[in-house]
Amino acid sequence: ADTAPEGLVPDNVKWSFYIGGILLLGAIFWTLFTTKEYPPEEQAKYTGETLETHKGSGISSIFQDLANMPKAMRQLGWVQFFSWFALFSMWVFTTPAIAHHVYGCAIDDNSSQAYSDASNWTGIIFGVYNGVSAVFALFLPKIATKIGRKNTHAVALTCGGLGLLSIYFAGSPNFLILSMIGVGIAWASILAMPYAMLAGSIPAHKMGVYMGIFNFFITIPQIVSGVINRPIV
């Protein structure tokens, strides 16, 4: 069933989470049991680095690296912050937004058939942007070779921004497919280009810690979005 009494979760939503959880756990365990990691001693033989290079003082070393972030990483951090702020907002608010704006539901309606239709359509258009992302990702290397990584990412983010803005002008559910094409182009680049740009600007022996720090610019904007967006809306 795709509807439920007020205060309850429809069965189709429950099963979506069950299936998604099983697939996620399967992917984690597959990676865990099939990926071979090399010990530091073996890696040091091939890189010419000593193990002392990789030693630090734990948390204090991480804060020191955070303070000494390369300039390119600081610049990309701001781009990541606003990209993921927008994405988290989209994931949370797309269903109620199109339910009200496209399907004509009341603001406080979250249990009618029309709201359920909006929720189901959100799942479809989210599938569209992920499909577009998978296809567009195949062309990213060629585009980046032609115009550069920075310009590639800028163009892709522009497409995503226009896609999100176009939702406001959507007069029918099918129009939202066009919106999600733009989002899909941005999504492909967000998952690849920042890391490609970052990899060339950080020391090889600091790759792990800086990639971890870089992920702060993914999690923190989502936390901020979750805290402030509800009162704003």
What are the language-model segments listed below?
Residues 158-171:
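C-terminal ends and interior cores of transmembrane alpha-helices
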Residues 189-203:
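Intracellular juxtamembrane helix-capping segments at the cytosolic ends
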